[in-house]
Amino acid sequence: MLALYHNDMSLCAQKARVCLAEKGLPWEDRHLVLRDGVHQQDWYKKLNRRAVVPTLIDGDKVIPESNVILEYLEDEYPEPRLSPKDSFGKAQMRLWTKQLDEDVHDASAAIISFGIAFRHQYLERGELGRAMLDQIPNLFKRERRRDVIEKGPDSMHFVIAVQRMVQLLDEMEEALAGHPWLVGDEYTLADVAFTPYLLRLEHLDLLGMVAERPRVADWYRRCQARPSFAEALRKWENEKYLTLMRERGGQHWPQVRAIMAGA
């Protein structure tokens, strides 16, 4: 049986769970509480040298990185199909998921989440929070996150993150003009990969960002209607995190809206 090291509210772990649900694949739950730092322990780093979730285990094979996991599952368990039949369609799908790896995840969605909500978890922990931050292997990622934890929405990284999210939503709105899904008439790994990012905006009470993008709003409603949404996302929602995100998101919506106006 497959096994997944994951976290309930991790965007990247959510992607993997959606894919597993769409494929109807059973898997062993190996949930990690990230705020306890278990993912930074040596035993886990042997599985995932970047000390992030998710990590998929398939027999004696270890597959890290969420987008790599999606493609592995598609190749290894091809039914039901979640990629276009033609090479050009597959290339378009990969261009979408490539954005997540390049900057949308770390430099936009994660920064918005930390700048609004998660920074308070680190600040409340004081020295322990700083020690956890120091454990992030990537220097640039660590210092960018440190800045946004210290300054919140006043960090320039936060401003850039919101602007990048606006750009992404505009690109999605344009792509959805000619067909119902991001890469044509069929639901693919591109839709799997981006669904958690709209859910994160919902959790942060920032769905106002899609108010003037009706095609994106409709796409998200259709993603929510799929059985995988309840199975892989709603079922795993952590009420403590939801309360923090919604309360803080509502407080900072005026700042986000102001950044959007100047984007």
Question: What kind of region is each of these model predictions?
Answer:
Residues 29, 53, 185, 210, ...:
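A generic structural-conservation signal
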Residues 212, 217-263:
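Long, positively charged, glycine-interspersed low-complexity recognition regions
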Residues 102-221, 225:
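GST-like fold's C-terminal all-alpha helical module
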Residues 1-139, 152, 250, 257-263:
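GST-like domain detector, emphasizing the conserved glutathione-binding G-site
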Residues 7, 33, 189, 236-237:
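Short, solvent-exposed turn/loop segments enriched in Gly/Ser/Thr/Pro and often Arg
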